[in-house]
Amino acid sequence: RILSPTKQGGLDMEAYKQEFIEFMVDSQVLKFGDFTLKSGRKSPFFMNAGAYITGSQLFTLGKYYAQAIHDNFGDDFDVLFGPAYKGIPLAVATSIAYSQLYGKEVKYCSDRKEEKDHGADKGALLGYKIKDGDRVVIIEDVTTSGKSIEETYPKIKAQETTEGGIKIVGEIVSLNRMEKAGDSDESALDTITKKYGFPAKAIVTMQDVIEELYTNGDKSIITDQIKAEIDK
């Protein structure tokens, strides 16, 4: 599904959230059933951004991210940082979409799993090389525990030559699972904001998904049984 931009560059808030939820389901990115997560924990739903595999899907995905970033952070940023590996196509697709929708050129950057020690683009980063004065938005698919930011944050700050030289404007993810992070009573995104001091936002929350597919839906995707599991 391709977005139909308004004069301001995107859809109204509720419309784009509803369409994004349908887009995730149609793309087989968001699934409901009985899943075992990497942590070993059971979950009634599973999200895999690696299922976005076609050009049209990535083109559309970039537009949803671009609007969410614009709505949450405005134009107060220069760089999209997508942690390797899944964050790389997210950063690329969104930088393209942001230029198209809002007329602002945004650079993309990612980290390398292994630092390159030769060539003109050697170093720990892929794409644009972040430096002092840059304003960065971190872009990821989803965060369950907030552990990924523990790796990403120091990699970005390591590029500074003066303390505070690089500003992290915020983080954006596809879905806020709204689950407690570890032993905390807060969600992973709330924990990130509290610990690092920048806002962590999502295109949609799990509550948005439930409202669209269960409360307002026909319960064919989120059944009564799955809803009960989500509520546990």
Indicate residue ranges for each PLM-predicted region.
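Active-site-facing substrate-recognition patch
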Residues: 12-73
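Solvent-exposed alpha-helices and their adjacent loops that cap or buttress functional pockets
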Residues: 38, 127-131, 193-194
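A contiguous pocket-lining binding segment that forms or flanks enzyme active sites
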Residues: 125-170, 176
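PRPP-dependent phosphoribosyltransferase catalytic core
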Residues: 14-22, 158-232
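Short glycine-rich phosphate-binding loop at a beta-alpha junction
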Residues: 75-86
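Phosphate/pyrophosphate-binding loops at sites that engage ATP/ADP/AMP, CoA/4′-phosphopantetheine
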Residues: 66-77, 157-163
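Short, glycine/charge-rich flexible loops or terminal/linker lids adjacent to PRPP-binding catalytic cores
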Residues: 90-136, 147-151
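Short, Lys/Arg-enriched N-terminal segments with co-localized hydrophobic residues
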Residues: 1-12
